[in-house]
Every structure is written in C-alpha cells, then in structure tokens.
Regions:
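Conserved hydrophobic/aromatic beta-strand scaffold that supports enzyme active sites
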Residues: 36-38, 49-53, 70, 92-94, ...
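Short beta-strand segments in beta-sandwich/barrel cores
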Residues: 59-60, 76-80, 92, 122
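Glycine- and acidic-residue-biased ligand/ion/polar-headgroup-sensing regions
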Residues: 56, 65-82
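Double-stranded beta-helix
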Residues: 106-134
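Short acidic-glycine-tyrosine-enriched beta hairpin
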Residues: 81-100
C-alpha cells in the first residue's frame, strides 16, 4: 500500500453504529407520525442517508426530489398513492428524478422503517403540482 493511500485511510476513522436505535431520542420528529434518523449528512455534495420511520396511518405529503433516490425497506410496508406496488421488507426502491409521489403507511401496518439514500433537496407540492415548501 502506498504511503499516501495509507495516510488517507488513517485520516478518517471507521464509524459503526446501530442503525435502528433503541433510544427514541435519536429519532427526529418530521411531521405527524413521521420521524427520521440521520446517518450521513454530506454538506459538500448534498447527499444524505437516513432511516425514515412512519407509524400506521402516516402520510408523507406529495413531494419530489431533483435527483435519484434509493430506498431499502427494513421493516413494515408502504406504498405511493401514484403507483400500484407495495414496498415490503427486502424491497429495493428507485425513485427517478423529478417524480412527484405521496408515501403512505396503511392503518393495518404498525410502522415502517426504510433506509433512504438521497441526493439534493426535497420539495413539497400541492394537488396542482405547485411548490409549497422545500
């Protein structure tokens, strides 16, 4: 291993943490029945990775991302009102840039937890596709 590579690998220590914490204080309230657990917040390139937790009956309002989003369901299940599929544990989800969707956890599901890898902003839209918040 080159000296430069060795120095680079030693400059940043490993980070190993329990992804789904027992400590409720690590979940950040986002909206009614919705919490997130930040894992990575990269202010250089706008990348973020988090766990999203939504309780039964929870709805993440209509929103869009300007860049791709990748998700992996760890617990429970959820769906988008705009699609006819249901994401269940082990499901990998790709959201194309610019798609507007509404994430729903149905009443019969206790809660869902999904790992999301996001690039860029998140904008919320009304039913006329007008930006209302970002």
């Amino acid at each position: 291993m080159s000296e430069e590579l060795l120095q680079a690998t030693q400059a940043i220590p490993d980070l190993v943490t329990k992804a789904i914490p027992d400590d409720e204080r690590l979940w950040v309230p986002q909206a009614d029945k919705i919490w997130f657990r930040p894992l990575i917040l990269n202010t250089t390139n706008g990348e973020w990775v988090n766990l999203l937790r939504i309780a039964k009956g929870g709805v993440m309002n209509r929103h869009r991302h300007p860049a791709p989003v990748y998700g992996y369901v760890l617990k429970g299940e959820w769906r988008y009102l705009e699609h006819d599929w249901v994401a269940k544990p082990g499901t990998f989800v790709f959201e194309p840039p610019g798609e507007i969707h509404t994430l729903v956890v149905d009443e019969e599901v206790e809660e869902m937890i999904t790992l999301f890898h996001v690039f860029g902003a998140l904008g919320y839209y009304d039913e006329d596709d007008t930006l209302i918040q970002h």
